[in-house]
Amino acid sequence: MNFKAERINIALAGGIIGIISVALVLMGNPANMGFCLACFIRDTAGGLGLHRAEAVQYIRPEIIGLILGAMGLSMARGEFSPRGGSSPVTRFFLGFFVMIGCLMFLGCPFRMVLRLAGGDLNDVVGLVGFVAGIIVGVFFLKRGYSLRRTYKQGQGEGIILPLAQIALLILVVAAPAFIFFTAEGPGAKHAAIIISLAGGLIVGALAQYTRLCMVGGFRDMILFREPKLLIGFCMIFVTALIGNLALGKFNLGFVEQPVAHNDALWNFLGMLLAGFGCCLLGGCPLRQMVMAGEGNTDSAITYLGLLVGAAFCHNFGLAASGKGPTPNGKVAVIIGLIVLFIIAAVNTFSKKESAGTERS
């Protein structure tokens, strides 16, 4: 694929994903939440009973479809390649703290774009924080930060998470008594299962084909002046904006925004944490889910970190709400930033010391 065609494909994929995101809201998803990896993983954690926040309990078919769509296309293209072993424990905790940052802001990088397309100006502060977090991450990348190489693994390792998603799909369709469903709140707002699943499958396939990644877009722009990946997310914004304007769902302002708060400092710090953590991971939650579908077990571990992080956020009062951040959540974000700085510094500068010792 030549360079120009690659950019065109990314733009087309972004445009389609933006349209799907608006369509899912029209079909029942919460406003400005046609797609949100953090929110949907949080809802799934609630649906499984990992937390008991009654307003956000529903196994989201979009996540299931996203992973299965990425797996299906990667297999069709001969790109399904089980691999892992690259600092899995570190990745788990990075995913954990990324979720804390996202639930302080009330959205992942994907939803950040959709919130902006819906007129939520609080998102501008979040975007600045997100980019600042990536810049901090790039500082360490330039100095040698790395989570080591991955190793080839058996086919069985690569299909465990996709098989788990099929099990979740069976549960949400069968609706047994031990699975939780929100009666009122964001978790109760959703498109029909088949529509949500189809949306996820398409987004997963498109993201796998184009390597869409919000973090990768800004990172590559900062490091290499390469805007390719950003084109996709710009197109998501443009098509979602046009869709919201056409459907009368555009609401410009800071207040009375759906599933959002207007505390600028903590919107900034939440996305600073998310951007920093995603940069250290090597990709945003969307990219992590796609790589998990491709057989990457490190990304599957990151998914588990996100899932456990979501459960912790609601079990211990860390998640923000439309009323604003909680005291516990503020402490958790600060702790998360400290932990990430420690992980990045130890990883980066201990390598330099060991390299210097070897040379001497």
Show the residue positions of the predicted features:
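Membrane-interfacial helix-loop segments of redox and metal-homeostasis proteins
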Residues: 1-360
